[in-house]
Structure formats: structure tokens, C-alpha cells
Amino acid sequence: MKEKKHFKFDGRLVFVGFGSIGQGTLPLILRHIKMPPDRITILTGDNRGRQEAAHYGIKFIINPLKHDNYRKILDPLLGKGDFLLNLSVDVSSAVLIEYCLQRGVLYLDTCIEPWHGMYTDGSLPLSKRSNYALREEVLLLKKKYPKAATVIPTHGANPGLVSHWVKKGMLNIAHDVLGDVKVPTTREGWGKLAIKLGIKVIHCAERDTQVAHPRKQRFEFANTWSVDGFVSEGRQPAELGWGTHEKHFPADGYRHDFGCRSAIYLGRPGMSVK
């Protein structure tokens, strides 16, 4: 059965990075978005996914982006109205976002990444090596370019897709409790709906149901996420969201001295926390 095309995109699309997520996303884009394969380019740092790209007739370029070459590489590939889909690691999301804001390019990624080595850079204080710091850096760009092209960062599964499910869940509860409700269109609107429903905190947990071969043994830890991401983020300081209602504070906890201060961090890497 022929799949329905939900949208027609006339611009160019550039993948930055083409690991497992990229290879899984490409056929979905071609299935659900009307755009010719010759307007898609894959820009990546290694040979992974070449066969997948060839199967769909997609241009495949191996040329790792670095802080001193990204503009030269991207300039011929992207212009106003085009789309950069960032699925890479070790490439600064903030740098790519600002590049897109300056050129009118649409942007989407699954997480905010730094340049290679930032997580373990001893010249930076722990606070500056955190995901909190990466997020604050991106939020500053929103203020710097208030009327630029649309940028959606950290829209993977969680955070990202889970936000849509949470909103749908809130609407289901509202329908059962309050009757017909108007769907909120702003952040403040969703906050007001949460107050009406008596919601104070929403915690999203994941249960991994993947089964590999050979099967995981008892007491064995198996990582089913990105290996690169798992290792690099495990070396970052452990981070916790921290609300105004908290009644205690960890013995080795520290507060950030910049940004919205909605999180704290521990003075040790995440991989050491039990």
C-alpha cells in the first residue's frame, strides 16, 4: 500500500551524522515527506550507513565537521529555506544552530552536543561541562536571534517525543475531569492547565523492552543506547533537576551561578553515582 505523504518540502535537507538514528530516520522521511532523494545530502564522519544511503540514492559525503571547517563545508549545501537535521556526536549544536539562524535554515536535533573533548576538559569548571550549561548556551541564541528561522533542539525520544505524549495525556485527563477544554497553544497555557488538574510534577521513566542475542544475563548491565553517548555523558558531572519545593540538598551538590538555576550538579561524574 502506498504511504500517505503528509508534507511537501521544496528545500534541501542535510543530515549531519548518519549512525543508527540517521539510518532509521531516512526511510521515514522518504515515506512520509514528499521530496526527491537528490535534494538530500548525508554529511558524516565515517563510513557507517553508506549502503543505506546508496539503497535510497542519497548523496553520501565523509567530511567530519570541526570548529575551523564547518562553514566552508556547509555553505554550498544550505541556504535560506533549507533544513539541517543534526544527528551527530562531537559537533557543537550551538555553533550549528547559530549558523542556521544566521542563514535562515531550519534546524532539528535530538540532543545538545559540544565539540569533542568538552565533557572532560579540565580547564573548564564542572558547571560549564554540564548539559545545563549547553542548554543555557542555546537559550541565549533565542534572545540573540528573536525572529530567525525555526530551531527545535533536544527533540529526540526523551526529551522530545515524550512531550507530545505528556500533552496528550493531560488532555485526556482534562476531558475526563473538566469536560471539553481548549487545547493550550503556549507554555503558559499548559502550565495553567496543569494547575487546574492539580499536577505538580510529571516524571517520565523509560522501560527498555529490547531483547538482543545473546540475551542479557542476570546482574549484567547492557547498554541499548548510543555507545558514544553513553561513555561521554557518563563522564560528565551528574545532574539533577531541582525545584523550589526541594527540602534537602545532596552533600556533594552544587548550584549553578548562571541561567535559570532549575538544576544542580554533583561534584563527580555520572558513571560513579549509584
Locate predicted features.
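NAD(P)-binding Rossmann-fold cofactor-contacting core
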Residues: 36-54
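Conserved Rossmann-fold cofactor-binding substructure of NAD(P)-dependent oxidoreductases
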Residues: 65-78
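A short, basic/flexible loop-to-alpha-helix module at the beginning of a structural domain
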Residues: 1-11
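Conserved N-terminal Rossmann-fold NAD(P)-binding element of oxidoreductases
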Residues: 14-19
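Rossmann-fold NAD(P)-binding glycine/threonine-rich loop
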Residues: 91-105, 110-148
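Glycine-rich, aromatic-lined ligand/substrate-binding cores of catalytic
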Residues: 199-274
